[in-house]
């Protein structure tokens, strides 16, 4: 792999505030997404991902403000996901400074959204977010990995491996693969899931869910991911971006 491995902090934003506790002593307001994104930029993050977890649509414009303020002081690619339902939503996020836009539930409900966005803005803009988990008990999917929605609370019955393959055909430029089983456990990424997806798609995979220590990151790249994403280990100051990059470098991977 000649391309540099990307290290990406993820910020969950609810009504303009970062949720999932953040502990940085040098920030005046650790709940401010713009300040936090700027801190990660200073730390050497390769990209920033914002996930708008606001339930109500009344706060949609708040996210636009967050993105445009961040774009003024953070000069690395920015992906914004959550609540993106139409090509118009994508357009408004790109106009205010996002480089890429993540789609999830809306694409499951209407897969043509992927091709409509890709045709209009280019594949490189579209990141398909997949919240997948291993099936327990009776298996309904061929791979044993199922797509979920509502933060893992709702089963779709859709095979996650089939879905990423289909999304690539429709024009997705990248897969944000989030393991709902590993998410929050700090016990490492779901390597088997990453391998299964890598076998089926050529587009980049961002591994998400389960990072707890620096040693967790190289195996995800070894399994086939092109980038690694984490939230709480960075927010709580357990690890810095530099820690993760040093570990990846130690294992022979190129980092920026």
Swiss-Prot record:
- What is this protein identified as? Imidazole glycerol phosphate synthase subunit HisF
HAMAP family of this UniProt entry? HisF (MF_01013)
Write out the catalytic residues in the record. 12, 131
Its quaternary organisation is:
Heterodimer of HisH and HisF.
GO CC, sorted alphabetically, is: cytoplasm
Provide the primary localization.
cytoplasm
Pathway of this protein? Amino-acid biosynthesis; L-histidine biosynthesis; L-histidine from 5-phospho-alpha-D-ribose 1-diphosphate: step 5/9
Q: Which organism is it from?
A: Bifidobacterium longum (strain DJO10A)
